[in-house]
A protein has these predicted regions:
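Transmembrane and membrane-interface helices of multi-pass
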Residues: 2-313
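Alpha-helix initiation and N-capping motif
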Residues: 212-215, 315-322, 339, 343, ...
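Membrane-interface segments at or immediately adjacent to transmembrane helices
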Residues: 290-379
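Generic structural signal of hydrophobic/aromatic residues within well-ordered alpha-helices
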Residues: 103, 136, 218, 319-322, ...
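Membrane-proximal soluble helical/coiled-coil segments
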Residues: 220-223, 232-236, 342, 346-357, ...
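Solvent-exposed soluble domains appended to multi-pass membrane proteins
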Residues: 351-371, 381-382, 386-734
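Intrinsically disordered, low-complexity coil segments
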Residues: 33-45, 254-273, 340-341, 354-371, ...
Length: 734
């Protein structure tokens, strides 16, 4: 039998079950000894029976019990060696918890020691134990996800450990120097490590501060993933369990002397003790706050690589990286900013629009047509819709979504869409489209939907309402996801149709209601109301994960790129099957729109690529600049199509690279609708800067430039857009 081979078998549970039984037997023995008052029990057990069952032993026992049960339901897949080692560690932690008083007695007992000597020994013991708790906590967080743990850079390692230690010390003093506070901290660190593990496995990314506001959304879509624990997670939990066991050794030395011997009965806390401990907690808490606020960790070199946050977390440590990310949540005012300056820059761009674009014959024709008939505007943001053929046809002849690429030759325009998220973060692409604001000027690491109030901010539904449009948002999932219910209200949508507005037996595919179900809802809106409609539909069926295994065999694609693992290619084919299904539903939808006796313009785009695309990108595209290499991962597709002849437009399916922040302005410009000053400025900016996302912008020379590149030929324009974004959005936030 190979003890190092990963296995998934109920028999694995026998190992932790045996250790749990041994721990329980020791627990029973100690309890009986305490009742009898025999020499088997430490002196401090005799007066208080409950002291033989501290939480320091309870938590390891519960952990062993969980490990014994989880293999029976397929939630642990690990090696025998790992299970044996982790179970032994948990058992040892439980033994420490059970015998904590005897251990402390052995370490601190000295009948001839003075009070000062006892205090010193006690303080030294607590210091050593706290160091052990912090060390266990560090490994509890890092081990589950950090495959390069030995490579954590030294300067950042020390800061990371310090940031981790401060909360432990605060809880130590708040708990009057007892075990509970540090023990709870260790458990919380273990939970964080487990969360990091799952996010690494599911999304190939790390937990960012903004994710805390999106926790409800994560929970709502959590059902599509496999939560099997493997070696890294199991070892991390074992470390957390040992931390709890070590923490049980903490406790104040509150004994006097009786007949020259240590008194077994602890003395009660005095008011002075409580005040001193609380004062120490307050001082440590102040240091903790200062450590989170005062140093600018980005300037110290701990800047997060938002292209790949996981890399930064592994190099700098999870806690330091998380704190650095929290400092990025603030939308910083641009340098040399003033409202007057930003307004002047906006007016200058509007003047350029009026001079260079407003008089265009095609625009004039579209304006005249719009005055006579306002087309309904339908926008579909399709979950994870992208054309993976950009990866050299996946080196297996993949041509991309067939109808999308070849079935709408009469579209107004189509092309690549440069988005700001990968593998998740759908709401940020939504935000960019509906507000026209690029994440490039808000800063990285934010989810605006989750943290801002949009009541006083400009948004497309409000703009179209002034033109007589009724607006509807559709998303076939929970309305609380990404805080959409409140956000859509703030943006001015008249109604929001969520999963609650669809039949329980509505057709499903992969991870949600089919795209077609939402399209039928849109068609119903268009048929039942003759007034111009603005409908924004966020689909769900293609949502990750892609190892669900629920695609019918006759609909499952079979592309096998060479040099890539079979597991990754299995993910690819489940994903491509979803894209194929979406493509078929899109063909149906376009066919139905053609039958309508009313003008409709359809804007269809993908929110982001799948997270595993990086496997192919890294394997096949080497030697590129980091920016150009990563931008491939942040590219989806869009099309703008109409079921009527748009005046002034050849409808020749022009290939036009763009971004979600520009797309609404492009749409309104194409159909002849009135434009806001900001949209006019965007259209002027597009002439120089065709595409922009959170990481950079594309020049007319075909090169990508980083957003903070002051030497780029577009740095001046980028600075102007930064000012204008702050003027019209950031300063209006509540």
């Amino acid at each position: 039998m190979d003890f190092l081979t990963t296995v998934e078998s109920p028999a694995l549970g026998l190992i932790p079950a045996a250790f749990a039984a041994l721990l329980l037997l020791d627990w029973i023995r100690m309890s009986e000894a305490a009742v009898r008052g025999t020499d088997d029990a430490a002196p401090c057990y005799r007066p208080r029976r409950w002291s033989v069952s501290p939480a320091g032993a309870l938590f390891p026992f519960l952990m062993l019990a969980a490990w014994a049960l989880l293999p029976c339901v397929g939630l642990i897949a690990t090696s025998i060696a790992a299970m044996l080692g982790c179970s032994a560690v948990a058992f040892l932690a439980g033994v420490i918890g059970l015998h904590r008083d005897a251990i402390r007695e052995a370490l601190l007992a000295d009948t001839d020691a003075s009070r000062g000597q006892r205090m010193f020994r006690h303080a030294l013991l607590d210091l050593i134990v706290l160091a052990g708790v912090v060390a266990a906590s560090f490994f509890a967080i890092e081990q589950p996800y950090n495959t390069t743990l030995a490579c954590v850079q030294k300067p950042f390692l020390y800061i990371d450990v310090l940031l981790m230690a401060l909360p432990v010390v605060v809880l130590y003093f708040l708990g009057q120097r007892r075990a509970a506070g540090p023990g709870v901290a260790c458990v919380l660190y273990g939970v964080m490590g487990l969360a990091q593990y799952y996010l690494w496995r599911f999304k190939n990314t790390a937990i960012l501060p903004a994710d805390l506001w999106a926790a409800g959304t994560a929970a709502a879509v959590a059902g599509g993933y496999s939560y099997t624990l493997q070696d890294p997670a199991l070892i991390g939990l074992a470390c957390a369990t040992m931390g709890v066991g070590l923490a049980s050794l903490l406790g104040p030395d509150r004994r006097g002397k009786v007949d020259g011997k240590a008194d077994a009965e602890p003395k009660p806390h005095t008011a002075r003790d409580v005040i001193v401990n609380l004062a120490c907690a307050a001082v440590t808490a102040a240091c903790m706050v200062a450590a989170h606020v005062d140093p600018t960790y980005t300037q110290m070199g701990a800047k997060i690589n938002y292209f790949w946050p996981l890399y930064t977390y592994r190099q700098h440590g999870a806690i330091l990286s998380f704190v650095a990310g929290s400092q990025d949540l603030v939308i910083h005012k641009p340098s040399d900013y003033s409202d007057e300056k930003a307004s002047s820059e906006l007016k200058a761009l509007v003047a350029r629009y009026n001079k260079e674009l407003a008089g265009d014959a095609s625009r004039k024709a579209a304006e005249s047509q719009f005055e006579g008939q306002k087309p309904s505007i339908v926008v579909v943001m399709n979950e994870t819709f992208a054309d993976m053929s950009i990866y050299d046809k996946m080196k297996s002849g993949y041509e991309g979504p067939k109808f999308f690429n070849t079935g709408m030759t009469d579209a107004l325009s189509h092309g690549a869409l440069s988005v700001s998220v990968n593998g998740g973060g759908t709401a940020n692409t939504e935000f960019e489209f509906l507000t026209g604001n690029s994440m490039a000027f808000l800063g990285l690491g934010k989810y605006p939907y989750s943290i801002y109030d949009f009541s006083d901010c400009e948004a497309l539904p409000k703009q179209l309402a002034k033109l007589g449009y009724a607006s509807t948002a559709i998303h076939p999932n929970y309305p609380s996801n990404w805080n959409r219910k409140s956000t859509y209200e703030g943006m001015g949508f008249d109604q929001f149709l969520s999963i609650e507005d669809f039949p329980e037996d509505a057709p499903r595919f992969h991870n949600g209601l089919t795209d077609k179900v939402t399209y039928e809802k849109i068609l119903e809106l268009l048929r039942d109301n003759d007034e111009p409609q603005f409908v924004f539909d966020v689909t769900m069926q293609n949502h990750s994960d892609y190892n669900v295994g629920n695609i019918p065999a006759d609909r499952l694609t079979d592309y096998q790129p060479e040099g890539i693992s079979g597991d990754t290619n299995a993910l690819l084919n489940e994903y491509l099957s979803c894209i194929q299904a979406s493509d078929e539903d899109l063909e149906y939808f376009v066919g139905e729109l053609k039958k309508l006796d009313r003008p409709v313009i359809l804007v269809f785009f993908g929110d982001h690529q799948t997270n595993f695309a990086s496997t192919y990108n890294d394997a096949w595209y080497k030697g590129e600049s980091e920016l150009a290499h990563n931008q491939r991962l942040y590219q989806t597709v869009y099309t703008m199509w109409a079921n009527y002849d748009v005046a002034g437009n050849d409808q020749a399916n022009v290939d036009d690279y763009t971004s979600p922040a520009y797309l609404a302005a492009m749409t309104l410009n194409a159909v002849g609708a009135p434009l806001s000053d900001y949209q006019k400025a965007e259209l002027v900016a597009r002439k120089t800067m065709p595409a922009i996302n959170a990481f950079g912008y594309l020049g007319t020379d075909g090169k990508w430039y980083e957003t903070d590149d002051e030497d780029s030929p577009m740095s001046g324009l980028a600075a102007e857009l930064d000012d204008i974004t702050y003027l019209r959005f950031a300063r209006k936030l509540k």
